[in-house]
Amino acid sequence: MDLTQFNTAGIVWLTVAAIAISYILQSSFLSWYRLRHIPGPFLASISSLWNVLNIVTGRTSPVLEKLPGRYGPLVRTGPNYVLTDDAEILRHVNGVRSTYPRNGWYEGFRVDEYDHMGSHIDTSVHDAIKSKVIGGYNGKDGIDLEGAIGSQVKTLVSEIRRTRGSRPRSRPRWMPARWSRSSP
């Protein structure tokens, strides 16, 4: 067989196709290999096609709910994604000195394009903000939070009784159940 018989454009396209196929196979193998110890559906371990199929068919939520029962508390749902239903794993991942970095998912919590403690991706900035506000969460700041909320609820109830009367109406003016859809 003489190589001069081949068209130069055909050789170029064959080379491009070989490089593309090689790249796809190599990237699929590397993405599978990194999280190979975490069980899950095989198609989910090598590509995002498994997630796309679940989204398109509208069964993402029921499928994801069943995965921990089938594969265990930590399940691989994509080449770079894992799912857990174990609170201890979540505490470990989101812990104070966790080595797991935050990803872009947390940016969705921004309010009017301003970052806050829950939306910062940089762990050091997140920890700095957290150390400033932790006093409000640990209960050692001397504020009787339950008593303060209880007194505000009592004030609200007394104000409602004062302005609307103490007796409830026999029938409300509008009925939200009429506008809702009953399930069979």
Curated annotation (Swiss-Prot):
Classification via InterPro entries: Cyt_P450_sf
GO biological process: alkaloid metabolic process
Keywords for the protein's UniProt record, in alphabetical order: Alkaloid metabolism, Membrane, Transmembrane, Transmembrane helix
UniProt biased composition (Basic residues): 163-172
Alphabetized SUPFAM superfamilies for the sequence: Cytochrome P450
A GO cellular component annotation in the UniProt record: membrane
Membrane topology: Single-pass membrane protein
Start-end of Low complexity biased regions: 173-184
Segments passing through the bilayer: 10-30
Applied use: Loline alkaloids show broad-spectrum anti-insect activity, and different lolines may have different biological activities. In vitro tests of NFL, NAL, NML, and semisynthetic loline derivatives with long carbon-chain acylations on the 1-amine have shown that many are effective against both fall armyworm larvae and European corn borer larvae, but the effects seem to differ depending on the modifications. N-Formylloline reduces the weight gain of fall armyworms by deterring feeding, and does not significantly affect corn borers.
Induction: Expression is induced in loline alkaloid-producing cultures as well as in planta.
GO molecular function per UniProt: heme binding; iron ion binding; monooxygenase activity; oxidoreductase activity, acting on paired donors, with incorporation or reduction of molecular oxygen
Record's subcellular location: Membrane
Region (Disordered): 161-184
Family to which this protein belongs: Belongs to the cytochrome P450 family.
Function: Cytochrome P450 monooxygenase; part of the gene cluster that mediates the biosynthesis of loline alkaloids, potent insecticidal agents composed of a pyrrolizidine ring system and an uncommon ether bridge linking carbons 2 and 7. Lolines are structurally differentiated by the various modifications of the L-amino group and include norloline, loline, N-methylloline, N-acetylloline, N-acetylnorloline, and N-formylloline.
Designated name of the protein: Inactive cytochrome P450 monooxygenase lolP2
Native species: Epichloe uncinata (Endophyte fungus)
Source organism phylogeny: Eukaryota, Fungi, Dikarya, Ascomycota, Pezizomycotina
Gene that this sequence comes from: lolP2
